[in-house]
C-alpha cells in the first residue's frame, strides 16, 4: 500500500480490496447457477392410471427373464443368477432346453433403446415387459437401466424375487410386477398392433397419422431370438410389417419411437 498526501492509502496494482474480492466471489456464485429458463423441465411420467393422454406403449413380449438357483445354504444363503446362453450353456443342455430360449440380452438392448429415446424424455412413452413365463412388469419411464449386462442381470434377479425395485433416494417404484392381463393397464382408446414379417408393409409415420387425436398405440414386440409371431394374437387388432428385411427387436422399437416422434413433433 502507498501513502497519499492526505494521509489515505492507495492499493498497489497487484492488490485488491476486500470489497472487490467479495463482489467477485458473489458474481462467480451467481454465474454458476443457470437462469430458470435454461433448467430443463422434467415431464410428468405416465402411469397406467392415466387413461386419456396419447402415447406410445411398447410391450416386450416373450422376454427371456428367468432365474436359476446356483447354490443353496451356506453363510451367504441362496444365490440366484439370470439364466443366459453365454454363462449357462451346459446347464441348458442338461435341462434339454434350446440355447436361444435364454436371451435376456435382447430385453436389455430394447430397454436401453426405448428409455434413451426423445419420446420417453418427453413423457409420451410407456414400457411393459411380459416374460415367457407370463410375468408382467411395469417399467417406470425415469428408471436408469444399467448399461452393462452383468449389472442388468443382478437387477432382474432382484426384481423377480422381490417383485419391485425402489429408488434409493426418493423411494419411487422404478420396476414392479403387476397383475395380468396387459389390457387392464392400457388407455381407454388404444390401437393394439404386433409386428410380423409376413404382414403388409407400412411406414411407421404414415401408420401413426391414421390414429385419432386422442388415440394411443400399443406395439407388442417379440423380445426373443426366434419364434412365431402369434404371441399377442389374443390382444392385437392387426399385424403390420416394418421392413423388407428381418429386424432385431431393438431396431423395431427404435423405428416405432422415431415414427411417433416425427408425427407428434418430438425432437
From Swiss-Prot:
Site for Stabilizes Arg-103, residues: 105
Keyword rRNA processing on entry: yes
Binding site for S-adenosyl-L-methionine: 195, 222, 227-229, 242-247
Ranges of biased composition (kind: Low complexity): 16-32
Gene3D superfamilies (UniProt xref): 3.40.1280.10
Signal peptide positions on this chain: none
Record-level GO cellular component terms: nucleolus; small-subunit processome
GO terms (BP aspect): ribosome biogenesis; rRNA base methylation
Disulphide-bridged cysteine pairs: none
Organism: Candida albicans
Span list, region Disordered: 1-46
A GO MF label: rRNA binding
Protein name as catalogued: Ribosomal RNA small subunit methyltransferase NEP1
Quaternary state and interactors: Homodimer.
Localization, UniProt: Nucleus, Nucleolus
Family, as annotated: Belongs to the class IV-like SAM-binding methyltransferase superfamily. RNA methyltransferase NEP1 family.
Known EC number: 2.1.1.-
Purpose: S-adenosyl-L-methionine-dependent pseudouridine N(1)-methyltransferase that methylates the pseudouridine corresponding to position 1189 (Psi1189) in S.cerevisiae 18S rRNA. Involved the biosynthesis of the hypermodified N1-methyl-N3-(3-amino-3-carboxypropyl) pseudouridine (m1acp3-Psi) conserved in eukaryotic 18S rRNA. Also has an essential role in 40S ribosomal subunit biogenesis independent on its methyltransferase activity, facilitating the incorporation of ribosomal protein S19 during the formation of pre-ribosomes.
Catalysis performed (reactions): a pseudouridine in rRNA + S-adenosyl-L-methionine = an N(1)-methylpseudouridine in rRNA + S-adenosyl-L-homocysteine + H(+)
This protein's encoding gene: NEP1
Site (Interaction with substrate rRNA) residue list: 103, 144, 147, 151
Entry keywords, A to Z: Methyltransferase, Nucleus, Ribosome biogenesis, RNA-binding, rRNA processing, rRNA-binding, S-adenosyl-L-methionine, Transferase
